[in-house]
Amino acid sequence: MGLPWYRVHTVVLNDPGRLLAVHIMHTALVAGWAGSMALYELAVFDPSDPVLDPMWRQGMFVIPFMTRLGITNSWGGWNITGGTITNPGLWSYEGVAGAHIVFSGLCFLAAIWHWVYWDLEIFCDERTGKPSLDLPKIFGIHLFLSGVACFGFGAFHVTGLYGPGIWVSDPYGLTGKVQPVNPAWGVEGFDPFVPGGIASHHIAAGTLGILAGLFHLSVRPPQRLYKGLRMGNIETVLSSSIAAVFFAAFVVAGTMWYGSATTPIELFGPTRYQWDQGYFQQEIYRRVSAGLAENQSLSEAWAKIPEKLAFYDYIGNNPAKGGLFRAGSMDNGDGIAVGWLGHPVFRNKEGRELFVRRMPTFFETFPVVLVDGDGIVRADVPFRRAESKYSVEQVGVTVEFYGGELNGVSYSDPATVKKYARRAQLGEIFELDRATLKSDGVFRSSPRGWFTFGHASFALLFFFGHIWHGARTLFRDVFAGIDPDLDAQVEFGAFQKLGDPTTKRQAV
């Protein structure tokens, strides 16, 4: 059958057995990819520094998804939070990867079996003797089973009743760990950053799915609705399934890019909005101010800032800084972070504290401007030295470090001051190892950026697929060349040339 590549799926159009076979094979491919990708990531993942070289800096994509569902241990003897373990148990990273690969193999065999034994009695309509599927009944079965799975996940896995719970952290991504979560049944459950909403929404949606499934199993659709929505046509199923998938893809693209309890920053990296709004910078200054209020020195207050919090406040971890088509992990861009140099405080010769204006997300280059507490420009690194009034040399800017590796060190040499002013544009200053991975110094995006781009792109593609297949199933007779105004009954698809009224018609 000489089908063009874009028509090959017609071979399973009226063949339920082989339609099932290709779907099982698709599941085998998806599960096989997931397991294989997990093993590859585990082979290249370095768990030694969860603070400065976490999974998202290393470009891990499937490990964060396993971790947020409660997997934290490896058969290699390490824990994702940096500790060592002696008994990781079956459900380790490798155990989950292996389970997916075994499941993939079983699905592969099942797909072959169903391809060979396609003509099963279960697919045969006893009234006509032809292959057919009771699509409304199948819809009810699937809705019921997915409802059971959804309810079970929310009521048992997430709550820890029978399962590990999920990854939960504080708003600044410092204390994350896997723990049971109680359902949030109040209005707080609608806050996307409240983990309890994950449990309550799965329980509620699962209950609704179970009830809806039972409804569709026990109640037949009205004839006019059945015909109007073409419920007997498998392409209707394809169209509505694509709609469900593209809607879900748009939703998760949003929760990933804007952040939510389902996408913790410890696993996927910070969001761009946290840089734009100075989210971590404000928390750092709040902690320093609290320390000063307790009569700590500036050095002592900055020394108590967690390195993890300081690292989030660095533009290289902003997922919007990496180009969409720059391949590789963040570590391949600006390098592997080795240590925090400390917080630079700039002062002019009058002793006034100056603040470097930070680079906005969508700039590659940005002028070095130092302002005082009132936002008035006091110093800069001029483009044209002949016209400069506020140069570091003229204003006499010095820099002193608090916290980090350079704690207590100060510089007055203009070249060194300008070097650190340029680096302060990018947030907190870190020592970065670019030699190990031959990093090129060009920022990369995090898995948060890749996931969002991929799902938004496929959602758009699938949206058009939904429109395409929905139109095909609703207007199938028109596309086949059958005029609805014809008096004579016409055998469906009997026109040799679509829409050609001169072709011989065959009465039914």
UniProtKB/Swiss-Prot annotation:
Protein name (record): Photosystem II CP47 reaction center protein
Xref: Pfam families: PSII
Subcellular location: Plastid, Chloroplast thylakoid membrane
Subunit relationships: PSII is composed of 1 copy each of membrane proteins PsbA, PsbB, PsbC, PsbD, PsbE, PsbF, PsbH, PsbI, PsbJ, PsbK, PsbL, PsbM, PsbT, PsbX, PsbY, PsbZ, Psb30/Ycf12, at least 3 peripheral proteins of the oxygen-evolving complex and a large number of cofactors. It forms dimeric complexes. Interacts with PAM68. Interacts with HHL1.
GO-annotated biological processes: photosynthetic electron transport in photosystem II; photosystem II assembly
Gene that produces this protein: psbB
Record-annotated membrane-spanning stretches: 21-36, 101-115, 140-156, 203-218, 237-252, 457-472
Source species taxonomy: Eukaryota, Viridiplantae, Streptophyta, Embryophyta, Tracheophyta
Domain of life: Eukaryota
Membrane topology, from the record: Multi-pass membrane protein
Family the UniProt entry places it in: Belongs to the PsbB/PsbC family. PsbB subfamily.
